[in-house]
């Protein structure tokens, strides 16, 4: 009996060793973290999936090394992704805890381990979409919820050494020096003034356009960097033309400028770059985002009042 069962156990172990991991990203930042995580598990096989509601040059750039890339704009594509990604996995990695498609993929798949990583500032914001009471829109059609993904993750890779995190402290693994730049800025004394975009409203684009246009003019910025999911166009500004997220685009700016002055409304860039040499990051005070800005202040980020000249 011992010799008869041995091949069965061996086959089972071989199957386990051949099981792949699924890692899902939905933003350029998530894609950058996903690639980092894949390198940590370099001996393991990954299926890398990129899902986005908006496809643009930046999304294309950061998804270029992914096995499957989906622009999910309708129900048919949603079902295609769900059917194609529902499999048996060793580990499933995700960042967007309340993404309906991720909830449904996890609910329908078989897996041994759930792992997660940061989606950005939302992970450490006590009044954010991952910390507030569960909303019906954060429940998948198979019953899996945002809170299930948060509570059931075994390990969470984070950028932030914060006293609050939506994932339990003992599960956190810190990504040290994640945004460290391997470049020496040019020595010419020049400063680039940059404004980062913000999606103020999901329903009314004119709110975002008015805010951004007003402050871009008041600050007389050299460059404007749109939000990753931005669909609107801002007139009378010079766009920083690059497929890179701003943290990576600094490499290009430092070829022409010795210093970079960054303005934002509530961007997590303020956390990522606050200790970067030759970079000054300033938040623009707006009552619209009072709570979020106060939390960023608590995290050590600076905010300033910008005179509009009205």
Predicted regions located by residue number:
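A nucleotide-sugar donor-handling region in carbohydrate enzymes
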Residues: 117-119, 124-192
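Catalytic binding pocket for nucleotide-activated donors in carbohydrate/polymer assembly enzymes
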Residues: 269-310
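Conserved catalytic-core segment of nucleotide-activated headgroup transferases in glycan assembly
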Residues: 192-230
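Short, Lys/Arg-enriched N-terminal segments with co-localized hydrophobic residues
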Residues: 4-18
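Donor nucleotide-activated moiety binding/catalytic core segment of transferases
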Residues: 75-82, 228-276, 292-293
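Short, hydrophobic beta-strand segments that form beta-sheet elements in well-ordered domains
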Residues: 23, 46-52, 92-95, 114-116, ...
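Well-ordered, non-membrane alpha-helical segments in soluble/globular domains
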Residues: 35, 78-80, 99-108, 205-219, ...
